[in-house]
Amino acid sequence: MLSPERPSDVPRRTVLTVGGVGLGALLTGLASSPAFAVDTATATVPAEQAATSAAFPVPDSAGIPPGPAPFGWNPVDLLDFDPATLPWAKHLRCLVPRATRIEPFAPTQAHPDLDPAVQLSTLTRYDAGSVYGARPQPIGLEPWAYTQRYWQYIDVWGTWHGVVSHLTPDELVAKPSGTAGRQGAVIDLPDPQWVEAAHLNGARAIGGWFWPRGGVDFNGFLVQREDGSFPVGDKLVEIRDYFGFDGLFINQEASITATQVGKLKELFRYIKRIDPDFYLQYYDAVLPSTGSLSYQNVLNERNVPWLGTPEEPVMDSVFINYGWYSGPDPHLTTSATTARAHGFDPRQVAFAGVEHQKGIFNPSERFGAVAGPGTPAPTSVGLFVDNQFWWTKALSGEAASIEGRAGLRDLEQRFWSGPTGDPHTSGRTVAFSSGRQDVWNYQRFDGVAHWITERSPYGALPIVSSFNVGSGAGFWLGGVQVRDSGWNNQGSADRALSWQYWSEGDLAVRLDETVAYEGGHSLALTGSGVLHLFKTDLTAKGRMPVRVHAQGLTSVEVGVTWRDAPDAVDWHPLVGVELGGWRTWGTSLRLDGRRVARISLRTEGDGHLGKVAFLAAPGVDRPSRAEGFTVSDAGDVKAAEGTRHLSFEWQLADGADAYDVLQVGTEGVTWLGRVRRDVFFAESVDLTRGRLFTVRAIGRDGSYSAPVHARLA
């Protein structure tokens, strides 16, 4: 059900022919070139540009999304889990393995004296800005929904908010939050788009366990067989394996009996025994000996038993409640001492909670007092609702327009990179006074980059980025606009840049949603200077082809920082060729087996950076075709005649990193979506534009397979 404040018209998927380029040129060109094929004049500003706060999408107002949607479980339905009978199960899987991150290398850190052992966990509102709160929509038409682009700092991402059980009647799910019977489930399946994005960047992604929940018998979780196994434990491991996430955040926040808490510990110990990679983080709430709710605000002898022992763990870590700074452990030394006394590394097992849901840029917890460049933190840190700024602003309509989202992306940059927006100059510029006051003043917050070193998955070539953050008001392929309406799918985003944005000289950088080379965004550059892009650990004996697509720039150079000479940057000029509205800059660098520790660009002129690629070899590593491509009708759209929901399936292709699905019409093609699995649900497809569809596999170097077609009967 739509809120009366939300526009009732269905977002359009317009077929475009841009700069005279139609179906043949687009598909043939993209299939024959490694990531950089069709270049044409810049397209029109997307239709989303005109959105205003007068009629905006109201967060958590629309009930159940069409098609796939993650949900929650309680014991009665958890034990009945069977993917063969679960609607849309294949659409909720993450097939992306968790990337390996390179080892720390201090000379190329934004802060060389920042301790890389300090970790970061987050509890993030998965639905910030989305109209779907009861059950999130993994792929949708919502450019106003938040997507994370600072994965380089996150070690453990956790879902927050709570989703409604799939056994709850639809009419109740569609009711406002708090309605009697609209009950959140105990165990939340994490939204697969978040899991995919986390894994691409080497982070863990965990679901949620939320207690109390009304109408649920807690003892149902604690049933134990005679052989010592737990049916719920077996089923949780099965579910994690099928859906591809990494574990659970245990928010056990109501007292239970001593007998129950003893069984609960045994359940978690059993899970860790049969699946050591099942990551469990416990919130500092219920005590492990008595079952009583008692926030300790410190890791101490009362709650440390939740960790078990190094040889037989119960939990992997504890999220320490927020009262540590004004309470028993202001310097976190007691927590660190307790962890070490029990054989644990405190940075691995103790995460000091910081409450951003209320504090935003000025939380009461001052982790920066015990952490920062030159100050090794005793423990790691956990952020509660790091994206609260987006949720709050979305409630007043600020996320509904491109201009509004630009402001929110700027706030996001200040949150993660510090008040200057540059991670190598992070650190608060206004002294701390009282927490949870003046919460929108970003000068009061250090920025996460002041506490946590950037992590990197860039240990091998190719490295390709078009600065796609997994949402946008339009979509472009090769400089051609092939969609002029909004979309979101965080799982389709590129891997995060290592720094956003570490620049030198008078260069200013911002994320721009009005134009792109591929995806939904580009980087707008003003002035001249250096932009550091990727922290790497690369070794190659041959050459590294370099390709850069940009508009308006008069000069582009690529800079290599060698690991054996980290104090200097080795600069190489790129040669540009004008093709329509984008200039392709390129060169080929000889690496000769030396280790590359960082890749940077030096530019002159105002313009846009659309795509960068650092390739493994001169040839194209094209993926195989996505065979077995089919399309089926998945339901009508009541608000628009001739518009249908569609479901697509195909076989995974060798060498494929992702897949683009497009609609083919007489006027051109329309991009429907990009996914990293073998199924795709497309919402609200206008069939008057055509009933022929195509899928193309995309390789790691950005090259495209030959298209495979299917027609809707």
Each language-model region and where it sits:
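Conserved aromatic anchor
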Residues: 644-654
